[in-house]
């Protein structure tokens, strides 16, 4: 049977239309499929918890930590955050003040874990961090800490807490060996430190390192947290006639007062301490008492190994809006770099699940950006850390670190130590 000519034309036109519609539909599907991994339809903010001393003698460290983590989070967000599937993730920082008090630190960590739902955390205070490390593991909360006590390392292999500060037990041998080589006429060392867990770790590590370096180790002097007058303790330690006095691990405010007291009592030897900046010490003690001091701070001097990102941090601290900003602190570079390790691990893992991020950190040979140093790399577990901690060495970061000499009231690089 013949089909009328008009009907044939209609059928042809309809077929052409259907083919065109199918092609457009397929093309749209292809475009949608290609963009689903890069275009997010959902936004989610991940809270990064920080428990640290924002007031009290250790506040310069705590404010440095809050600033460093916040600025690293800002940079993570500015670089595009992290898109996984149809969700775009950015970071925000929640910082709580523990005033370097164990009870406050414990309450803060519990609040962030149980009430605020934080899954990524930075902690500072020794006893609180130690006490709650098992809880954080049970709750699968990834925690980076700067606790000096090596018990934070002596955890099960599945622990979720990592020390991202080169603990003094790792640094002690190189620090004292460098002093011995650089100041060959100095033969003896004594420790003036806090009467707590942190102080005990400092004392034990120094004693072992002194023996390895060939330095005479004198009796340590301990003082209670909150001490305002250091005259009795300085008098006691000077009676031993040490060439080197070590105050590593002591709060910044205490180090400044000790330096001032040592100078007032005529000490002419070497005062060596930890991550304390010349600018903070200058405010407390003045220039003369801190001249020649050794610290583990990173001098923000251009033209060397220090990265441009870190060199720009002080100006960003001053310009940043909000309470507790407007001042640049000594150790912001360190906490900025530590936070960068965590955030780089998130990106490499392509996940905001702490379990997945932890697996990336634990991966053999994994390397992460260490922002303080040009082309800086950080790893967890190395010959240096494994030699001290054995199977637990994977919970200790290994990276290059500076020895700083204060000259004319300013930080200068004495040397950069690269762990073997």
What are these regions (language model features)?
Residues 103, 118-220, 268-301:
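Extracytoplasmic ligand/sensor domains, especially the bilobed periplasmic-binding protein
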Residues 39-45, 60-64, 82-155, 164, ...:
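Beta-alpha junction/loop-to-helix N-cap segments that form part of ligand/metal-binding clefts
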Residues 61-84, 204-210:
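Short, polar/charged alpha-helical segment
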Residues 49-70, 96-102, 125-127, 192-201, ...:
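Extracytoplasmic "Venus flytrap"
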Residues 1-47, 78, 84, 417-420:
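Short, low-complexity disordered leader/linker segments with a strong preference
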Residues 259-336, 347, 417-419:
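Extracellular/periplasmic periplasmic-binding protein-like sensory domains
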Residues 50, 112-125, 144-146, 189-193, ...:
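Periplasmic-binding protein-like
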Residues 320-332, 343-410:
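Segments of small-molecule ligand-sensing domains
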């Amino acid at each position: 049977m013949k089909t009328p000519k008009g009907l044939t034309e209609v059928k042809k036109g309809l077929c052409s239309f259907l083919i065109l519609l199918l092609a457009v539909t397929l093309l749209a599907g292809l475009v949608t499929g290609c963009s689903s991994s890069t275009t997010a339809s959902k936004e989610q903010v991940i809270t990064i918890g920080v428990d640290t001393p924002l007031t009290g003698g250790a506040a310069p460290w705590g404010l440095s930590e809050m600033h460093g983590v916040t600025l690293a989070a800002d940079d993570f967000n500015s670089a595009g955050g992290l898109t996984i599937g149809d969700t775009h993730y950015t970071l925000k920082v929640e910082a709580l003040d523990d005033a370097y008090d164990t009870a406050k630190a414990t309450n803060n960590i519990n609040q962030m874990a149980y009430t605020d739902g934080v899954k990524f955390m930075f902690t500072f205070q020794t006893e609180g961090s130690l006490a709650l490390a098992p809880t954080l593991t049970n709750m699968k909360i990834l925690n980076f800490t700067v606790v000096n006590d090596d018990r934070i390392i002596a955890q099960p292999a599945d622990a979720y807490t990592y020390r991202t500060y080169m603990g003094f037990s790792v640094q002690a041998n190189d620090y004292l060996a460098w002093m011995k080589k650089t100041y060959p006429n100095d033969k003896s060392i004594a420790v003036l430190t806090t009467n707590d867990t942190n102080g005990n770790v400092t004392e034990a590590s120094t004693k072992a390192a002194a023996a390895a370096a060939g330095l005479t180790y004198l009796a340590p002097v301990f003082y209670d947290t909150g001490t305002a007058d250091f005259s009795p303790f300085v008098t006691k330690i000077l009676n031993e006639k040490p060439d080197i006095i070590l105050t590593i691990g002591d709060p910044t405010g205490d180090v400044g007062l000790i330096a001032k007291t040592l100078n007032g009592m005529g000490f002419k030897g070497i005062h060596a301490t930890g991550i304390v900046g010349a600018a903070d010490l200058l405010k407390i003690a003045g220039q003369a008492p801190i001249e020649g001091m050794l610290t583990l701070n990173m001098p923000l001097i251009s033209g060397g190994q220090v990265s441009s990102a870190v060199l720009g941090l002080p100006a960003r601290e001053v310009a940043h809006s909000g309470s507790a900003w407007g001042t640049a602190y000594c150790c912001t570079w360190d906490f900025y770099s530590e936070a960068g390790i965590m955030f780089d691990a998130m990106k490499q893992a392509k996940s905001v699940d702490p379990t997945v991020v932890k697996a990336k950190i634990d991966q053999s040979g994994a390397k992460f950006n260490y922002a303080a140093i040009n082309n800086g790399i950080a790893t967890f577990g190395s010959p240096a850390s494994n030699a001290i901690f054995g199977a637990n060495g994977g919970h200790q970061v290994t990276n290059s670190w500076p020895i700083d000499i204060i000259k004319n009231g300013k930080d200068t690089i004495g040397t950069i130590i690269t762990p073997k």
